[in-house]
Amino acid sequence: MSEPSVEWLDVAAARERLEAGALLAIDLRGPPDYAGGRIPGSVSLPGRAIESRWKKVPTGRTLLFVDDDGSRVEAVCALARAQGLVVAALRGGFEAWFDAGYPVETMSDGLPPLEDA
């Protein structure tokens, strides 16, 4: 039996699950985009660094991978599943979140990027 396809969440479902604490948003965009605006409480893990930093990814919740527009997350979800992580992807990415008018925090508001060990 093949690996299940990515669980795509629309922004309303993602927001509800984030607020309930069932998801942790992992922002795959680069540092300038992350600093400029992101989903509140999200953790920065730029796509190019993700494989070398799996051990720093918090576990215990489903990881919601977020990119600019949802076009790059499927491959990252496959890599994360191979590491035994439970994952989902935000349909439409950060653009859809922003366009829906949902809360956004900036670097001065929230969490710093995930640091290298």
Predicted regions and their residues:
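Rhodanese-like catalytic fold shared by cysteine-dependent sulfurtransferases
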Residues: 1-24, 30-62, 67-117
